Amino acid sequence: MKENKKTYLVTGGAGFIGSNYIHYMFRKYGDAIRIINVDALTYAGNPENLKEVEDRENYTFVKADICDKAAIEKIFAENEIDRVVHFAAESHVDRSIKTPEVFVQTNVYGTAVMLNCAKAAWELPDGGFKEDKKFLHVSTDEVYGSLEEGGGYFYETTPYAPRSPYSASKAGSDMLVKAYMDTYHFPANITNCSNNYGPYQFPEKLIPLIINNALQGKKLPVYGDGKNVRDWLYVEDHAKAIDMVQEKGRLFETYNVGGHNEKQNIEIVKIIIATLREMLPETDPRREHVTEDLITYVEDRKGHDRRYAIAPDKIREEIGWEPETMFAEGIRRTIEWYFAHEDWMKNVTSGDYQKYYQEMYTTK
């Protein structure tokens, strides 16, 4: 007999947003839920992100690729899955420019596998789907393209206009989910979120990259003129939004999730420098070299989108979600986490990361 608790299948749960989501869910629901985490453990997936929960009886880790249909079918066959929360994706724009085919394989084909397996497991013989099942596809605001400086926002009705191989692959996966909802009446939602920051983020991304380099006295690479604008959201606020959409979102709807926090990249870098200097004791030798002199402008990213800005009106009005963490607080919490987890950073920045870093950040 099935236990009276919801079972969540989380894909990519060893990555940055996925692991934060799992931690959030266990903090909120404790033993009232069960989570199965399937992750291929590629370079950005780190089992250390989930050390605190790995011994829980209601947590199971499965090392598998979402493109492996047999492995995913086995999970559905052996478990009564109530929710799929689909994070698993290749997500770094720079890497997509070098190896776009990897992004198409994981983000588009992998999503098709997940959709097919969930559909097969949840379909009823006489049509329709089992009650209280839902597939939540986690996506990005980058599918909407680029906005002009100082004007306009992305809404759920904004036409898709992806400009990088990464955003094109995510747009493709979004369209697959939309097609399943339209064709099969498949129980799903899509969330499109702005840039996240917080604990466990792999240091190829801007904020952990700048924190890590500044503490080591290394150059702080800034693309182009540094004036590209992003909307930043603390990752725990994103985890809460996903949970609320799962429980309160209307089926077949898309919800934009944003932080109401637009900042230029160069602003972010300068805020991190100032916050590090404020937080480091005067006796800490690292404090002396954490200055704006480390800022180094590098060749701009190919096709670099100028501005992203999300309008989260719909999720606020329908579900009651709003970002709770102000950027000043969130960046301090993020820096505190990296201070407390220096060994984690050392482990993830060894080996292949150093080679990648040298390839990506050449001086102008």
Where in this protein do the model-derived segments appear?
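Generic recognition of short, well-ordered alpha-helical segments
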Residues: 20, 48, 74, 95-98, ...
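A glycine/serine/threonine-rich, flexible loop-to-helix segment
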Residues: 53, 150, 203-211
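Residue-level marker of alpha-helix boundaries and capping positions
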Residues: 12, 167-168, 201, 232, ...
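N-terminal Rossmann-like NAD(P)+-binding domain of SDR-like oxidoreductases, especially those catalyzing
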Residues: 1-196, 246, 275, 333, ...
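C-terminal substrate-binding subdomain of Rossmann-fold SDR/epimerase-dehydratase oxidoreductases
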Residues: 20-24, 28-29, 35, 64-67, ...
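Residue-level recognition of oxygen-bearing side chains
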Residues: 71, 102, 109, 202-206, ...
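A general, composition-driven signal for non-globular sequence regions
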Residues: 80, 164, 186, 199, ...
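Generic non-transmembrane alpha-helix signal with a bias for helix starts/N-cap capping motifs
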Residues: 111, 174, 206-207, 308-309
